[in-house]
Amino acid sequence: MATVEDNKKLIADVLSTYPEKAAKKRAKHLGVYEEGEADCGVKSNKQSLPGVMTARGCAYAGSKGVVWGPIKDMVHISHGPVGCGYYSWSGRRNYYIGTTGVDSFGTMQFTSDFQERDIVFGGDKKLAKIIDEIEELFPLNGGVSVQSECPVGLIGDDIESVARTKSKETGKSVVPVRCEGFRGVSQSLGHHIANDMIRDWVFPTADKENAEKGFEGTPYDVAIIGDYNIGGDAWSSRILLEEIGLRVVAQWSGDGTLTEMKATPNVKLNLIHCYRSMNYISRHMEEKYGIPWLEYNFFGPSKIAASLREIASRFDEKIQAKAEEVIEKYRKQSEEIIAKYRPRLEGKTVMMMVGGLRPRHVVPAFKDLGMEIIGTGYEFAHGDDYKRTTGYVEDATLIYDDVTGYEFEEFVKELKPDLVAAGIKEKYVFQKMALPFRQMHSWDYSGPYHGYDGFAIFARDMDLALNSPTWGLIGTPWNK
């Protein structure tokens, strides 16, 4: 394995290709973790370098694609030209239960299809008409969110006024989300804006409804926050929480509903999976309603057991005892999976580059299989994400923030990992380099990966990726 000095030299060599000014900026985002440091030593949440290939998305992607889109009983309007909605259509595999087009709308695409005349004369009347049509065609919808695209912000349409008017007319929530793509430096601002709109447009109504109707709570009510049910992840997590005796009142946003969202201020504990995208609303609920929150990790049996114990520690001895029973229940299953796959995967090296939590959360699952992480990085992390990462990585691990296409390729060529785990933009680049690859945004059409049952699928998929006989038929460029 490369040493700290080796990786620092690698970074310097890669940066030497850039012009001096660009190299100086990118140097702040590349580093090597050294044991005992409080963070990973890289800058984050800064504007991408103009002219480079970045894997980041925009604020619209963060709001519509991540936070709001999976809420299944709402109709989410991509307000602007057709392209943004079209290219974000059903890309994340947010599974849900329901009848599409009747009471669930997750895989449908709604757009206001802005034309030149809408830019010139404004799109408020068109938006109002669309909401009327939605109410007529899909009367069982639970509400509407308006996900504004770049032109809406540039021309100054008053989507808030339309939302207030239509909400009064329909008696349903109409939530305007100012997530124009040009705002911020990545999809991360879109997450924040989406959280703020829940705070400002959903919770005030929820507080009133909860006060009028009442809520029959229990001491064991929890909410799953920031699990988008990719390939069924939230379901496999929910099973474990219910097995230890907790009642899951709501899950955001995968397979979630607006009704569940409104019920969340009544829970006893918010369990946050994707910290980066949902910590804002979790902190708000802690401040306003006094609801504590806890980040958990259900990737790999080691972390699952630790997380179950930490969650149970927030409740009474009954829940703590049940947590131990559940951990013991799945122990044999986990040991059999590890016994089957670890001999085939032991010592294999991995480089990751994903989004908001997986560059650290998935590490324990790899380690449970005897695999070694030699490089990891985030697309849109903030400083606190890199601080949280220190507990997952080993000394001399290469760390890269908002890594460019060129940098990532050069790092991989030099470090020669056995497996690259990143996104769809990187997948075919590295497969053409004859490197095993797993798409870690949507599990390469597999999953779930959360929970004990998910770990079995994860182990199988890593084995299939690394030990497929096809790799013996093609060579990597550096071996020619």
UniProtKB/Swiss-Prot annotation:
It comes from the Bacteria. Keywords: ATP-binding, Iron, Iron-sulfur, Metal-binding, Molybdenum, Nitrogen fixation, Nucleotide-binding, Oxidoreductase. GO terms for biological process: nitrogen fixation. [7Fe-Mo-9S-C-homocitryl] cluster binds at residues 274, 441. The keyword Manganese does not apply. [8Fe-7S] cluster binds at residues 58, 84, 150. Its EC number is 1.18.6.1. PANTHER family: NITROGENASE MOLYBDENUM-IRON PROTEIN ALPHA CHAIN (PTHR43457:SF1). This is Nitrogenase molybdenum-iron protein alpha chain. It comes from Crocosphaera subtropica (strain ATCC 51142 / BH68) (Cyanothece sp. (strain ATCC 51142)).
